[in-house]
Amino acid sequence: MRLLRLRHGLAAGYSALRLRQDNCRCFSSSRVHHELTPFTRRLFKIPSAPSPPAQHHNDLTTFLSYAEHISLPVTSTVHVGTHYEYTVLQTLRRYALSLSRIGGRDDAGIDLVGTWHLPERERERALPVLVQCKSLKTKLGPNVVRELEGTFRQAPVGWRTRETVGILVSPREATKGVRDTLARSTYPLFWMTIERDGTLKQALWNARAEVLGVGPLGVEMRYGTTEDAESGSVTKEMILTWDGCDIPHMDQVEQNLTEFAEQWAASWGMDLSKIQKGELLDVAEMVLPRDVSAQLLDRTISDADRKKVIQALQERLQQQPASE
């Protein structure tokens, strides 16, 4: 099993998806959430998560408001567990993980599902991710690794792939038994220690995960001071990096994906509605001889194939009633 490399003094960033290549840089701390459209998700083959278990909250802020409204005790198992799951979800968005909470009575042991949009994979399918959160005060044994392995066999549709990654998250660091079991596993697995306030403390992954191309992944310990200048307290934080650069926040990734999808649709030279964009993908999948995402996202489709797609789409649109 591999312990994430430790790096010091690097303060750069990485653009996850551009039609042009950018150098490493830092991103602004201001975030704007870009909800991906069905068209964008389909273009990049991003699966949609199952329906959430709760209708009254979908992030930490709305959960805390709901918990206060119903007077849910903060020490209750439900409050502690749900709070931690949303905290983990929020923390991992910093590292290009888009996650949804699905934990509930019939969750098959899975708390969060989503995709990991690592740099250099912008032309490929993002890694599907299954997450188990173990918000326990006691030490965790090797059985939690075997439990995570079992979730692969019960994963939702869209997460039953050979590239699906399992992530165990706990406020406690991995014991030797956990590390050894993780190393022997034939599944691509990660262990992350995330404290209840969202601070990342430890990140480990096994050799099987390495095969999926996460070699450039590393860590950096960054130091700072508290906002209270008089106290002079020094803070330290572990962050994940990619080839020595900051991994972009998921908000930035979503913006890039949205912009790329719009540019891709516009590149066909047709003024298409949302429905017609989906039909363009339908036609491309029927006309093109190879995988549509590999051809279209890499912009390697030939002029002849492009003309075939446009002609087939125009014929389909002409056959539709004018109201559409």
Protein language model annotation of sequence segments:
Residues 2-324:
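Mixed-charge (Asp/Glu-Lys/Arg
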